[in-house]
UniProtKB/Swiss-Prot annotation:
InterPro entries in UniProt: Gep5
Localization of this protein: Mitochondrion
Job description of the protein: Essential for respiratory growth and required for maintenance of mtDNA. Required for cell survival in the absence of prohibitins.
Organism expressing this protein natively: Kluyveromyces lactis (strain ATCC 8585 / CBS 2359 / DSM 70799 / NBRC 1267 / NRRL Y-1140 / WM37) (Yeast)
Protein name, per record: Genetic interactor of prohibitin 5, mitochondrial
Principal location listed in the UniProt entry: mitochondrion
Similarity comment: Belongs to the GEP5 family.
Pfam families, per the entry: GEP5
Keyword Mitochondrion: yes
């Protein structure tokens, strides 16, 4: 145990000056950036192992010295607004489909089928309504008043973001998620679930209660937010440049350089509206077959067999 602590202590001291400088000044960074790094720093102090040190270094370069793209920022700032337009699929609707393999969003996402993106719609659904919200019963109003088309008074919903901005942001979020799902080696969680809300049925065949459905939307949005920001953040070009300079620093010893290469092995970028693998990561893993040429995919399959 003592020898292990000494090795870890030596490894920490051998970290690049950029990393150590950021850690020493963590409290000078914006509060929203401090959280992840302080959490990892506390974990390392409580249990100083190579694994906790890697997580600390990862947090410094992927959170403290990095900035999330706009769509992730909006997801974190306006989760309730986005949840109201979040795509979903009812379990009973899957049972009614002629060929769920071609039209079920849940199945398409489970198979990493790109058609899953085409089936998405971002419309205001009927859940997560304001308190005391009531949908007018037009037939009942007509029976009582004898007037057709008369609307009852109801609470007006006010969104903190324009609906079009919400839909644009959701489109980018789901493209971001699809990129990670089809490149699992980039992810802390290797097998990602479908990002849509899956609404189940009760044993009697009816849909589950609305309050439970509300919670499904809230939980799903939080899960996706944590995954895109905390667990698998995308690097800015500046953050990538810093990591590249560290990995290529000739003064780093072999063990420390290996640690940084491990940290950088999940690097990817968001440029000009598209996601791409960073050169820092390309040497560390193989992309999903969907992103490989046919010849390369066949060669890898043959090698695997």
């Amino acid at each position: 145990m003592k020898a292990s602590l000494l090795r870890t202590s030596k490894l920490y001291k051998g970290l690049h000056s950029i990393t150590k400088d950021a850690i020493s000044k963590v409290d000078t960074f914006p509060k929203n950036k401090q959280h992840e790094t302080l959490h990892r720093l506390n974990s390392f102090n409580e249990n100083p192992t190579r694994k906790t040190l890697e997580k600390l270094v990862y947090s410094v370069h992927f959170h403290l010295l990095n900035d999330p793209p706009k769509h992730v920022d909006i997801l974190r700032q306006y989760p309730n607004e986005l949840a109201k337009f979040w795509p979903y699929e009812m379990q009973h609707s899957i049972l009614e489909m002629d060929d769920p393999n071609l039209t079920s969003q849940t199945i398409l996402w489970s198979r990493n089928n790109k058609d899953a993106l085409d089936f998405l719609s971002f419309n205001r659904h009927k859940w997560l309504r304001p308190k005391n919200w009531q949908t007018p019963n037009e037939e009942l109003i007509k029976d009582i008043t004898g007037i057709d088309g008369l609307q009852s008074t109801q609470i007006t919903e006010v969104l903190r973001l324009p609906a079009e901005k919400i839909k644009e942001t959701l489109r980018q979020i789901f493209e971001h998620y699809y990129f990670l799902k089809t490149n699992p080696k980039l992810c802390a969680t290797k097998k990602l679930q479908a990002p849509i809300v899956e609404i189940g049925m009760k044993p009697d065949g009816f849909d589950i209660a609305d309050i439970r459905i509300d919670n499904l939307f809230k939980k799903k949005v939080k899960l996706i937010s944590d995954l895109l920001y905390s667990q698998n953040p995308v690097l800015t070009s500046d953050a990538e440049s810093i990591l590249t300079s560290i990995v290529n620093d000739p003064d780093l010893n072999r063990r420390t350089k290996r640690l940084y290469k491990n940290v950088a092995s999940r690097s990817y970028l968001f440029k000009d509206g598209k996601f791409e693998i960073s050169e820092l990561a390309r040497g560390g893993f193989v992309l999903s077959k969907e992103n490989l040429s046919e010849n390369l995919a066949a060669a890898l399959e043959e090698e695997h067999n």
